[in-house]
Amino acid sequence: MNISKTASTQGLELYHAIWELVGVTFFDKSRLANWSSWEHKFDELIDNEESALRYADEMLASLNDTYTERLIAPSTFVSPSSADDLPAADGKSADAATSPTAVDKPDEKPTDVMSALTPSKIGYLRISSFDREDIVELVEAAVAKIANCEGVILDLRGNSGGRMHQAMECCGFFLDQGLLATLKFRHEEGVKIRQYFLNEDQFFLTDEVHGGSSNGITKLPTDLYKRRAPLLFGKPLVILLNRRTASASEMMICALVQNGIAGRVHMVGSAATAGKGIGQADYELFEGKVKLRVTRCHWFAPGGEWLGDCGQTERNAIEPETLVDGDTGPEALKVAADELRKMLCANEASGDTSSDAPGSAPTDSHSAAPAIAN
């Protein structure tokens, strides 16, 4: 007896698996209002896996979400450790903005992380992507090279994001404590709320499920990690950004600005950031034959602001405090250096030397929320 599945049956199973996965993981329930109508819409038309994928793409497009898609290129895929994790917040990262202090060869892609210390003790740190497992270790090594600086330029131009967890962990090099970000996921019992924190000893995240039959709050186990040394805490900081600064890198900016010491954080850029307050997770179906990226969560700044979804429904981007029109790389870097020198001079004039003791308790005065572009 032949028990092998027909091409049509395999195609139907594949299409249905995609429909089911998106239906239980996609964050915005309002866009799933008519999702049930897609379950059997193409049953009579699907005759193999190729046609199943073609119709699945049409189904996914109905969500009007640029980031929920079937992944074609294997190099863009990051396998999640579990359905509740968010290992990859974004798609393939864009190339970093170039800078005159970079040491990349012209025919090579920019390195993900580099740092330099000028003779006048200005530290420069470029992070072009958070989309790799070892990014925190790379940043740690780069930070160590500029730990003796008097002020820092953090270059996040062109950084389209990557792994949210790693981006939040990197905040520990600049901050001593505080709420870093809040994420909201769909959950079978309601909404799962995840928050990232720093304290003197730990980098940790908490998970709570809100809702369910009792409309109560269920606290899940807290994940604790040894924090990274705050080698740059308290030092004047200028952050470089542009229109391609997005998602996890925007999370980092919000955390650094809203937890930073007032008068010691400044943003310079050629335009407002992308305004990508959403995160994606990647999934494999049919033993890796199909790879999907699904918008899984919304994230919020420490102050509660949502940056939007890159303008699909909203775009509430981060505005630079100092605008540099037509920046090609060197222009904004020069302005950033000038702004940093102004802060250093102001601190010297006021006799403020608190940055000499990284890891010491912060003052009570923190920076205002980043300017949001509506």
Language-model-detected regions and their locations in the chain:
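Sequence signature of WD/YWTD-type beta-propeller architectures
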Residues: 2-9, 19-21, 33-34
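C-terminal "post-core" interaction segments
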Residues: 8-17, 120-124, 128-131, 144-151, ...
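Short, solvent-exposed loop/turn elements at domain surfaces
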Residues: 24-31, 68, 132-135, 302-303
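Extended, small/polar residue-biased N-terminal targeting/export presequences
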Residues: 26-122, 351
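"Short basic amphipathic alpha-helical interaction patches in structured regions
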Residues: 33, 138-142, 168-170
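Short, charged beta->alpha transition segments
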Residues: 109-116, 138-142, 223-226
